[in-house]
UniProtKB/Swiss-Prot annotation:
Cofactor(s) it depends on: Fe(3+)
Coiled coil region boundaries: none
Cofactor mode of binding and number, as noted: Binds 1 Fe(3+) ion per subunit.
SUPFAM superfamilies, A to Z: Rubredoxin-like
Any one GO biological process: alkane catabolic process
Family as reported in the entry's similarity comment: Belongs to the rubredoxin family.
Function: Could be an electron transport intermediate in hydrogen oxidation.
Name used for this protein in its record: Rubredoxin in uptake hydrogenase operon
UniProt source species: Azotobacter chroococcum mcd 1
Domain Rubredoxin-like: 19-70
Length: 72
């Protein structure tokens, strides 16, 4: 079974691969675990599923549940 899926994350961390890149559906900001998040002081190598519960989009303050998996 693949750990990748199409569409919104909706809080289901079990469906995310550790290297999954996710994109905010409001402002299109991408969270790339290889880069992390400087605004929230998230270290590179941190999977989206391991982000703190209070984490929000650093660009538009959107809910993390609004992020979609990028399938490049």
């Amino acid at each position: 079974m693949s750990t990748r899926f199409e569409g919104s994350y909706l809080g289901n961390a079990a469906r995310l691969a550790d290297d999954a890149v996710l994109e905010c559906k409001i402002c299109w900001h991408r969270y790339d675990p290889a880069v992390g998040d400087e605004v929230w002081q998230i270290l590179a190598g941190t999977p989206f599923a391991a982000l703190p519960a209070h984490w929000r989009c650093p660009q538009c303050d959107g809910d993390r549940e609004q992020f979609m998996v990028v399938d490049d």
